[in-house]
C-alpha cells in the first residue's frame, strides 16, 4: 500500500525511480532496519504541530510503512537513530530537544541519537519537563 500523497507524484520520473528502488527492500522490521535509508523530497511543506512558526519538508522514505499508523511520521532525528541517519544523509536540521542529565543545553548530536531520559529544551511550552514521562503527557494533552 502506498500513501495517498504518492498519487501527486505518479508521473514524476525521479519519484518513479525512488519507488522502484524501495520495492527492492523487504518490508519486515529487520530488512527495513538493515536497508540503506533513502528518501524522495517532495515540494510539500508541513507545519510543525507543536510550533506553528516552523515548516518542515515532507519526504517519502523507505523506512516508513503505510501499514503502521497512518503511514507517516514526524521525524525526530536527534532522538531516533533511523531519523538521524536519514537527516544526516539529506542534510536536514537536527535539533536536540532532550538534554541528558549532567549536560549543558549546548550539547551536540553527532553520529548517535540520544534516546535516554532528560530535560526537554528547544520546545517552547514543553521546556523543563522531564522526558519521557511529563513531556509525553503534555504533548498528548496539546494534540
Question: Positions of the model-derived regions?
Answer:
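NTP-handling and nucleic-acid-processing catalytic cores
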Residues: 1-94, 99
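Residue patterns forming the tRNA-binding/recognition surfaces of aminoacyl-tRNA synthetases
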Residues: 72-143
Amino acid at each position: 500500500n502506498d500513501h495517498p500523497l504518492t498519487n501527486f507524484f505518479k508521473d514524476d520520473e525521479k519519484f518513479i525511480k525512488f519507488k522502484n528502488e524501495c520495492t527492492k527492500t523487504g518490508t519486515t522490521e529487520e530488512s527495513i532496519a538493515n536497508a540503506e535509508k533513502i528518501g524522495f523530497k517532495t515540494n510539500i511543506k508541513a507545519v510543525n504541530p507543536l510550533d506553528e512558526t516552523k515548516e518542515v519538508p515532507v519526504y517519502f522514505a523507505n523506512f516508513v510503512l503505510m501499514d503502521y499508523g497512518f503511514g507517516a511520521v514526524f521525524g525526530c532525528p536527534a532522538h531516533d537513530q533511523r531519523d538521524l541517519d536519514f537527516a544526516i544523509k539529506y542534510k536536514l536540521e537536527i535539533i536536540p530537544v532532550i538534554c541528558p542529565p549532567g549536560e549543558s543545553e549546548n550539547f551536540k548530536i553527532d553520529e548517535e541519537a540520544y534516546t535516554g531520559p532528560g530535560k526537554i529544551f528547544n520546545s517552547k511550552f514543553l521546556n523543563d519537563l522531564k522526558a519521557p514521562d511529563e513531556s509525553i503527557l503534555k504533548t498528548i494533552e496539546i494534540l
